[in-house]
Every structure is written in C-alpha cells, then in structure tokens.
C-alpha cells in the first residue's frame, strides 16, 4: 500500500527537523509537509533539508492545510493518508498500528487516542473535549473518546471525500457526520508529548471559540447535512 503522512506546519522551525527525523526513523511511509505560510524559518529549513514540502501563499489555517495534503494524496494515488502534527507532540512509532487497523478492514478512519485506556485531565481543553464527545454521542450514538486528536489515518475513500468535497474537514464535526454516513472508526491508544518549542496557536479565547463553533456544527449543521 502507498501511505502518505501529511504534516501541517505553521511556524514550526524549532520542531520540524525533529518531526521528520521521527517519521523517517520509525516508518517507511512517504510524507509531505504543508507549510501554512509560516513567518519564521520553517520554509527555509524545509528547502535546505530538501524535505517534501508544499507552501501555501497565505496563512489559511489547519483545515486548508490538511485539505491540500489530501488533494496531494488523492492526485498521487495514495491508499492511506495520515494526519500528523508538526509541533513534535505526536510520535511516529504509533502510526503502523493505525495503518494496520485500516489494512485489516477494522475501520476506514483510525484515530490515535489519548483516552482509550486513560482518563482525561480536568483542564479547560479537556472539558471542551468532553462536551464534543457528548455531542457526538448524542447525535450518532457512538462514543469517540478523543474527538480532537490530530493523529488520524484515513483510507482511500476518505481521502477522496476530503479531496473532492470542501465540507469534509479534519474536525470533530466531520467525524460525527461520517459516522452517521456509516464510516467505521476505531480509536487506538497512543501517548502524546508536550510541545517543547514554540507556542500553540490555540489560546484560551480561541479554544472557547473553536469549541462553541464545533458544538454548533455537530448539533445544527452536520446533523442535517446530506
């Protein structure tokens, strides 16, 4: 199978070398970095290291970055595409488990979950994650314990959906929508690290705004999307 890792990156100059080193040492999968118009040295480092990189002309955000990566995967006929953060919090050693779940026909989307066998911490972000979890369960009947995880593997049909339908995004509301459409999803326990360098773009204010928009979409938009 042809497998592609999509690495969205925005101002990850201090992390991207370590991320690609982790990927190449722990897998034999192809990768593409989607540089979201970073204003640090991310682009320069990628070019100097001769990494496979796509650079957006303006900052468009995570959704557009992943969608571009999916279009790349679709155009180049990949069988599985993996979403893998560029901030160093994900560990590539878990990716073969996600791939195997798809290869074995257990699911069409495999999620690297922090909470299959572990409880969530009582932080604002995790409270928000729990609210999203409950909304997904309310609208679909299925429990996704880590709906905001950014480590996911998608099969060929899901790649096509991303590449040809702009309403399909790497967000929890799309997960809820796809569940209702009969897409099989499996969560696999993984560990994630704390960010070592740089700052997360997700401030408390942005996190609250994000949570509200996702909850609204799950309950009132994706619920009725055909």
Give the residues covered by each predicted segment.
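A conserved acidic beta->alpha catalytic loop
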Residues: 35-43, 88
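Catalytic donor-sugar/metal-binding loop of nucleotide-sugar-dependent glycosyltransferases
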Residues: 143, 165-166, 176-193
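Short, well-formed alpha-helical segments that are part of the catalytic scaffolds
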Residues: 11-25
């Amino acid at each position: 199978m042809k497998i592609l890792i999509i690495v969205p990156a925005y101002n990850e100059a201090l992390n991207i070398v370590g991320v690609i080193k982790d990927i190449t040492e722990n897998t034999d999968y192809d990768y593409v970095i989607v540089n979201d118009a970073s204003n640090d040295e991310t682009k320069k480092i990628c070019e100097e290291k001769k990494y496979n990189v796509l650079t957006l002309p303006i900052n468009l955000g995570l959704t557009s970055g992943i969608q571009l990566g999916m279009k790349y995967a679709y155009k180049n006929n990949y069988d599985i595409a993996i979403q893998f953060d560029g901030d160093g919090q994900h560990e590539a050693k878990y990716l073969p488990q996600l791939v195997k779940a798809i290869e074995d026909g257990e699911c069409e989307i495999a999620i690297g979950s922090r909470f299959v066998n572990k409880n969530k911490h009582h932080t604002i972000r995790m409270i928000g994650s729990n609210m999203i979890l409950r909304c997904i369960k309310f609208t679909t009947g299925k429990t996704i314990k880590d709906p905001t995880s950014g480590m996911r593997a998608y099969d060929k049909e899901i790649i096509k959906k991303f590449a040809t339908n702009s309403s399909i995004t790497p967000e929890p509301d799309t997960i809820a929508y796809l569940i209702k459409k009969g897409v099989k999803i499996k969560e696999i326990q993984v560990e994630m690290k704390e960010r070592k360098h740089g700052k997360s773009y997700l401030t408390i204010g942005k996190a609250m705004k994000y949570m509200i928009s996702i909850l609204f979409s799950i309950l009132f938009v994706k619920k009725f999307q055909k």
